[in-house]
């Protein structure tokens, strides 16, 4: 169990001590997808959804979620994010929305969880706003795309 940084020798979960780490610029990108019926996607794309602009609401929800990750994930550090960006793209040929988030900071710990949380909550917001017209939407393929900075260096997911 000692390979997990959040688990001590006794098997207890603790927040990692990052006080001795170097401050570096760190960035992470994540993605999520929401699969839906063509009619649901058309409501979003055309802007005719009765609840308003689904993409704008999901974008703001994702940004807010990134800033609150430390409140949601028990062992995450509160971070002073310098950038949070959430992009949403309708992929009509596949009846889905792709969400990509980017989080950045200069700090002692990474922003992977913030990027993943932003993408996830944006996807959940799309579901919430559209569930009245379709309940069988599928949220999936949430993953880290890339991260830079820090001791572990650069990571890029396979395409």
Curated annotation (Swiss-Prot):
GO terms for biological process: Mo-molybdopterin cofactor biosynthetic process. One of its GO terms (molecular function) is GTP 3',8'-cyclase activity. It catalyses: (8S)-3',8-cyclo-7,8-dihydroguanosine 5'-triphosphate = cyclic pyranopterin phosphate + diphosphate. Pathway: Cofactor biosynthesis; molybdopterin biosynthesis. Pfam families: MoaC. It comes from the Bacteria. Its EC number is 4.6.1.17. Keywords: Lyase, Molybdenum cofactor biosynthesis. This is Cyclic pyranopterin monophosphate synthase. It comes from Aliivibrio fischeri (strain ATCC 700601 / ES114) (Vibrio fischeri). The gene is moaC.
